[in-house]
């Protein structure tokens, strides 16, 4: 019997060798090396976490948090290092989405006859 986790671990290892992963690692390093960008990224990450927690608990986002998000988003859009990081991250997630489609195909195929 196959150990699927061995395959998953190999996939994770292989992922680190892709151009997309390497580009993201470089983009993260660029942000880390710029104090302003790193601080802005941390602030953005903390606010996004707060927003997600509010959504998960069904609590409305305060006007203060909405304004903070808008202001922070404006700052992020003007920070070339973070914009580059986010674009690079998106490229990696597109690759991961393609991989997910590949390993989900057998499951989708099981249901194909039911969908007809």
UniProtKB/Swiss-Prot annotation:
The name this protein goes by in its record: UPF0342 protein LBA1592
Pfam family, one: Com_YlbF
InterPro entries: Com_YlbF, YheA/YmcA-like_dom_sf
Recorded family membership: Belongs to the UPF0342 family.
Lineage, broadest ranks: Bacteria, Bacillati, Bacillota, Bacilli, Lactobacillales
Signal sequence, renumbered to the chain: none
Organism of derivation: Lactobacillus acidophilus (strain ATCC 700396 / NCK56 / N2 / NCFM)
Superkingdom of origin: Bacteria
Gene3D superfamilies for the chain: YheA/YmcA-like
